[in-house]
Amino acid sequence: MYAVIKTGGKQYRVREGQILRVESLGANEGDKVEFDQVMMVGEGADVKLGAPLVEGAKVAATVTANGRGKKVTIIKFRRRKNRSRTKQGHRQNYTEVEITGISA
């Protein structure tokens, strides 16, 4: 069984037992979280599509880790201007979850 969930402004296709990195949820390690914005649920040829969400569908998960991703570097150059260069960078926070159940 698989599902398409929406969290952190992104959509993910998940199935039970899968480990997934999503935008930071603010939950501690070992906490149980529930995603209720389920856009699609499928098992074999049986597919339920939401418009935009599937009613009553939920995906349960357990938080396995919190961390920070690799550094993303941004460099801006402005042509024909003396010393007009900018270098910035940031590390995005993430939450790693393990999908424990899908119910529709």
UniProtKB/Swiss-Prot annotation:
Transmembrane segments: none annotated. HAMAP family: Ribosomal_bL21. It comes from the Bacteria. The keyword RNA-binding applies. Part of the 50S ribosomal subunit. Contacts protein L20. The gene is rplU. Belongs to the bacterial ribosomal protein bL21 family. This is Large ribosomal subunit protein bL21. One of its GO terms (molecular function) is structural constituent of ribosome. InterPro entries: bL21-like (IPR028909), bL21-like_sf (IPR036164), Ribosomal_bL21 (IPR001787). It comes from Hydrogenovibrio crunogenus (strain DSM 25203 / XCL-2) (Thiomicrospira crunogena).
